[in-house]
Amino acid sequence: MRLLSDGCISRPQGEVGELAVRGPGVMKCYYKNPEETAKVFTPDGWFRTGDLGWLSPDGWLYIKGRLKNMIVGPSGENIYPEEIESVLNSHVFVADSLVTEKEGRLIALVHFNRDELEARYEELKYDWEMKKDAWEKRIDELKKEVLDYVNSQVNRFSRLSEVVEEKEEFEMTPTKKIKRFLYNKRHGKDPVKEEDSKPHNTEAK
């Protein structure tokens, strides 16, 4: 196992890089597909997993997120959506979330836990005349609560600008992962350029 920078240069301990592996249990190539093989293997035969991580002084590997999901901030900071989503999902009223970028701002798409919401705002169940307006007011309050909750726990360049409610459950892949590309496209995230999808020289925090 080793951590890479720019595809093939090993990272020093403590710095974030792409995880590469090699061994008996790792595939050697894509069958009869040299082009795809070249994309995921280094010239000396290490398989690039697409995961970003760093090694602690005592040898523990910590995963930051996926290389293809990384967002480069306005001043070149590496922002890992999965780390922000972990904080979002720890909020009692958040069922699931996705962090994306829009016009240089970080946006959290959040699907709220309806059972928890109705337990908090139980009175809304019984007054159908006022329910819609009152519910929207409560949701606005909750979005502000979640925004403050997350921004108090992440570094300054990972702070959210806005929380947007996703009323329907997120569309998932067969492996139960959110189809990020659908929501990135829907909410205006700029396409990731090849040169921007590489970790900058950032110390692990």
Residue ranges of predicted features:
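Adenylate-forming
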Residues: 26, 60-89, 116-137, 156-161
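Conserved loop-to-beta-strand segment in the C-terminal subdomain of adenylate-forming
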Residues: 15, 64, 101-125, 151-166
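Short amphipathic alpha-helices in soluble, non-transmembrane regions
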Residues: 126, 142-147
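C-terminal boundary motif of the adenylate-forming
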Residues: 52, 57, 90-115
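Conserved C-terminal "lid"/linker of ANL adenylate-forming enzymes
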Residues: 96, 104, 145-204
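Residue-level signal for inorganic ion chemistry
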Residues: 8, 59, 88, 108, ...
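Structured core elements
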Residues: 2-3, 18-20, 48, 54, ...
